[in-house]
Amino acid sequence: QGKYRKINSLGYLGKYQFGIETLKTIGVHNCDAFLNSPKMQEKAFIALLSKNKWELRGIIEKYEGTVLNGIHITESGILAAAHLAGVGSVKKFFRYKGKRFIKDAYGTSLRSYLRRFGGYDTSFIVPDSTAKVKF
């Protein structure tokens, strides 16, 4: 929704709706500072994309540019789905070749994220297994 100070009904934080545990994996431990810093949120988003791009590199290499159950698969769609539904959910989706209905905590399907966020340029995101927010 683009609101940096937003906390949703499940406790996800900021413009990109980060979970607290996810923030910790990229080096953010102060939620108040995070909510009050658009710059930190933007850096956190890039760090998480880098981490997820590393984690999902095999899936991206194998499936990018293909059509799976009617969905044109793109790197940006995969990265968005990983951010919004989790890396594990993305791995499960591709393990079952898109035939399982996988959804996030709000009931939004992973397929819809792949469609909605497909086709964006994410070539500038560098895969990095140890990506952290640099303050």
Predicted features along the sequence, with ranges:
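Hydrophobic alpha-helical segments, principally membrane-spanning helices and signal/leader peptides
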Residues: Y4-R5, I71
